[in-house]
């Protein structure tokens, strides 16, 4: 017969092991974390494109999303506009349903507060989370 101490130790290890792995593995892991832009349309940074509304050449240098556990987020982007250094900031709320994350901005430095979505995935082995956002056919790929 197992001692009470052995049973309690086994139970603690089982609960601890399940808790430690629950939000880092599988397709439906929690989305909170810090995401750094890696590629745009599979092209590394810096990434340049022409803004159709202004005709200016924009070059993205970096972009970082911070998704907080309280459901708020911030986005900080550094870019050049026809060679002049500039930045973009956005903040708001985020929600998650499975692998889909919805961003609802309440502030945008360009005054665009239209909600948009991203797809999240998690690596069960490395714990790395990835996020892809499709902005009008241009796919921005981020990782933690």
Predicted regions and their residues:
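Bacterial N-terminal signal peptides that target proteins for export
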Residues: 1-8
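Sec-dependent N-terminal signal peptides
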Residues: 8-15
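C-terminal motif of bacterial Sec signal peptides marking the signal peptidase cleavage site
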Residues: 17-20
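Lipid interaction determinants
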Residues: 22-144
